[in-house]
């Protein structure tokens, strides 16, 4: 019953480690240990994943039944593999150097530097079992030769970029990616130079007409010439009423023309569309009609005043005669 329960628990999603081990194939050539073997509770396992799976089963049983206990996985293999694994991790591309015990102890007093955190490493099951129980790693430091190599690489990279700009056929000690970047930069510069040379001369000149002027010239339907009739001269023999009416009419026309010129200057000389032009003409005509009506209303009052003054003068003359 206990075994069936553990199998059911292994298949469930409650145990994340067991589900990961069940879903991932850990028995490939990289994670398997062909040279050594693994002992767990008097049983021999060929791969570390099988031994770890048995340990997980016992751990699940110990969580369900307190009487059961887990054992210890023993590795029948020399410790040289562990040192090879450490060298493989801490010497990528031969960039780091190992020191003997005296140099190592002297450097620890000055500075300690680890390469990567344990959680950020990608380790297989065999590597995890080879790690020490306390999880400690040996300290390494960046050697002076590595620093000088970096400086030399930077200097070579700078010289390569300057030489490529001067001479396109120059081949410096740079990486293929750097060569591609330099070639792309040179191509972009050449394309820009060709584009500037192919620009039309009319666009470079300062005397070229503006685009707004060209558009206004093309929109000839808006530039309709407006003609105004010249005012009719008024004879001096006419009555004062006719002269006052003519003066009011000419004044209204002058005001209309002045308002039109002001609106053109305020709008910046821009031509309006046909609908807007019609609206403005209607508004101006309404304003002219209102002013004309006001002048008509004021004219009879002036005539009445003139008649009353004439009558009063006539009455005074009659009284003097009598």
From Swiss-Prot:
Summary of the function given for this chain in its UniProt record: Might play a role in cell proliferation.
Keyword vocabulary terms for this entry: Phosphoprotein, Secreted, Signal
Keyword Secreted listed: yes
Pfam families associated with the record: LAS2 (PF15792)
Compositionally biased intervals (Basic residues): 148-157
Modified residues (Phosphoserine): 161
Name the record gives this protein: Lung adenoma susceptibility protein 2 homolog
Organism: Macaca fascicularis (Crab-eating macaque)
Extent of Polar residues compositional bias: 236-247
Domain of life assignment: Eukaryota
Region feature (Disordered): 148-175, 228-248
Signal peptide: 1-31
Predominant cellular place of this UniProt entry's protein: secreted
InterPro entries xref list: Cell_Prolif_Regulator (IPR052679), LAS2 (IPR031587)
KW Phosphoprotein (keyword) present: yes
GO cellular component: extracellular region
